[in-house]
Amino acid sequence: MNSFNEKVVLITGAGNGIGRATALAFAKQNASVVVSDINHKDGETTVSLIKEAGGTATFIPCDVSREIEVRALVDGTVEAYGKLDIAFNNAGIEIEQSKLADGDEATYDKIMDINVKGVWLCMKYQIPAMLKQSASAIVNTASIAGLGAAPKMSIYAASKHAVIGLTKSAAVEYGKKGLRVNAVCPAVIETDMFRRAAEGDPKKAEFIKSMHPVGRIGQVEEVAAAVLYLCSENAGFTTGVALPVDGGATAI
């Protein structure tokens, strides 16, 4: 894989899980990484891990559902490093566990504000900065729930379908200007969220694993590797793609 030497990378939701793993992976490839998260402690921890490994990173807190904070995040990135080459819009939430008719408006608004408006706001402010470069790339975190149905998670599924729609639209609108826009669609990945869901319930953990033809859940580093590929020169002819990282789950 190509080195990301001298590239400036902005990652939201980088305080843990997939975001942290991707921040570490970019830093290992010599990128300067702007770590962003709503949780200051988690974000600062990611920066510390990068610096301990010899990398370059800065933390800028951000609630991606707030336009003023997203604008400040992008402006702060350019102020710190002079440009923006790559963005990984990873911040998102998954809180729904009810059938559609049992859902409530507050849950709908919260999921859509972060998962959809957050990605839209990030791209709205990232794109003008990125078009100043000859080649740039955005990757948005969707989900396999954005590729089909997700029982008892209809609002979440709708939000991830929307992320894919935003991704494809941006790819078409800005492709001739050197900007590639793709999405990653993870299945179940071993994160703190998964561990909390399966804690004390071995049968549930085994059932979740069985959903994937490879017989296991994914690792955050595997999603990070997909993101780095999509942002690399090796993926120069790849844009508008929603890439499953799912152990074969969508093949069933």
Where are these regions (language model features)?
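Short C-terminal tail/terminal secondary-structure segment
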Residues: E94-Q97, G148, L228, T239-I252
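Active-site helix of classical SDR
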Residues: M123, S159, T167
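Alpha-helical segment proximal to the catalytic Tyr-Lys
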Residues: P128, V172-K176, G236
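C-terminal helical subdomain
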Residues: A183, E206-T238, G247
